[in-house]
Amino acid sequence: MYRLAAFDMDGTLLMRDHKIGSITLNALHQLADAGVTLTFATGRHYLDMKGILSHSGLNGYLITGNSTRVCDAEGNPLYGMDLPAELVEFVLRTPWQTNASIHLFRDDGWFTDRNDPDLLIAHTTSGFHFQLTEWDELPLTGNHKFCFIASHQELVELKAQLEQQMSGEADFCFSATDCLEVLPRGCNKGVALEKLSHHLDLTLADCMAFGDAMNDKEMLSRVGRGLVMGNALPQLKQELPQLQIIGRCEQQGVAHYLHHWLSSPHLTYSPEF
């Protein structure tokens, strides 16, 4: 039996309205009652996640900011990584050939120089919001990650620029088709979950994980059982063909799988609804 379950949020636990469905909530509570440690592994900020979990009546370990921070259920930090100050300065001062908006995340919040209220729709439950700033007003240290937001094709072109200029100095991943992230080198959900597992005297083989995007790849590929959402990015499905595909987030596919696993863990699972 798996002793820890790690869940991505957007496109996995959350439905298209950015909320956790009632069937999913029920399944998560059943899982916790069965003695399985809940872990939420997401690109979202710690403050955002605490609001979501409080609203939902859930508790668990948190891997946030795409693994730049790991906290226990009480919010105590267990592990963290920041971008090097010189890299932050380089990203902010380089005139990239793009119309993408840029967003910087720190312990004290989400910062941007572009006011786009539409981005707040995904954070209605928690009330988490960006803070408008001038980039030269922020410290160059203590920064978790950058996000660039634009159309996918524009971000593909930007990623090529970033990789050419910063090859080997940072990691890049698509947490959504319209969101490109710049992360500390070697920072991913697989590494973070391994550190958390060690803290809990577990191994990755003791874990199951659910995800839908490229920032979930390392986590899904390294755990004892990785489950790919039906709505996952095509690239993720292509790169992890050995993993089982379950239902879609809008169908509360995670709950469907968990109910099956809790009641009939040794039977073959079918994602049909």
UniProtKB/Swiss-Prot annotation:
What EC number(s) is this enzyme filed under?
3.6.1.-
Can you name one GO molecular function term for this protein?
magnesium ion binding
**Keyword list, A-Z:** Hydrolase, Magnesium, Metal-binding
Q: Is Calcium among this UniProt entry's keywords? A: no
The record's annotation in HAMAP family points to:
HMP_PP_phosphat
Under the heading NCBIfam families, the entry gives: Cof-subfamily (TIGR00099), HAD-SF-IIB (TIGR01484), PRK15126.1 (NF011705)
Protein name according to UniProt: HMP-PP phosphatase
- From what organism does this protein derive? Yersinia pseudotuberculosis serotype IB (strain PB1/+)
